[in-house]
Regions:
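Short, surface-exposed, polar/charged, turn-prone segments marking secondary-structure boundaries
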Residues: 12, 38-39, 45-46, 67-70, ...
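A glycine-centered beta-loop-beta connector
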Residues: 31, 39-55, 106, 114-129
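Tandem CBS (Bateman) regulatory domains
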Residues: 1-14, 53-91, 103-107, 127-138
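The conserved cystathionine-beta-synthase
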Residues: 18-35, 41-43, 83-86, 92-110, ...
Length: 138
């Protein structure tokens, strides 16, 4: 059955990530340019956090209102660091896990992306959309 398939069949490999010292504007640019909603944060290859599109929206519009792109980038970089904005120690799934493992975690509804790790190192990411497409054969 598909739910017992390895998570490696569903996950995106080589996920787009940022390093803890990168500017917040880089996260914003990646989300806008790549059309993604979640950006893992790494120290070397070790997963240490994740930033979501909604995290950025909360601080971008909640605190800074309507700024043009460059002004907003400057304000974000001056006010926030990646480590301050990220959710630290995110829940993840092992690269040796199954589709069922990921579905159980994502099914709780607290978030929509799950970093995939080998030990502590980021090796992929799986989203609720990835799981739905896989299970529906889309």
């Amino acid at each position: 059955m598909k739910k017992n398939e390895p998570i490696s069949k569903v996950m995106s490999t080589s996920p787009i990530s940022v390093h803890e010292g990168d500017p917040v504007s880089k996260v914003k640019q990646l989300i806008e340019d790549k059309g993604i909603h979640h950006v893992p944060v790494v120290n070397g290859e070790k997963l240490i956090g994740i930033i979501s599109w909604s995290d950025l929206l909360r601080v971008s519009f909640g605190e800074f209102g309507n700024q043009d792109g460059r002004q907003l980038d400057a304000l974000l970089d001056h006010t926030y660091t990646v480590t301050r904005l990220m959710s630290a120690n995110p829940i993840s799934v092992s690269v040796h896990g199954t589709v069922r493992d990921a579905a159980r975690i994502l099914g709780e509804g607290h978030f929509h992306a799950l970093p995939v790790v080998d030990g502590e190192n980021l090796v992929g990411i799986v989203t609720s959309t990835d799981l739905i497409r896989f299970l529906a054969d889309l």
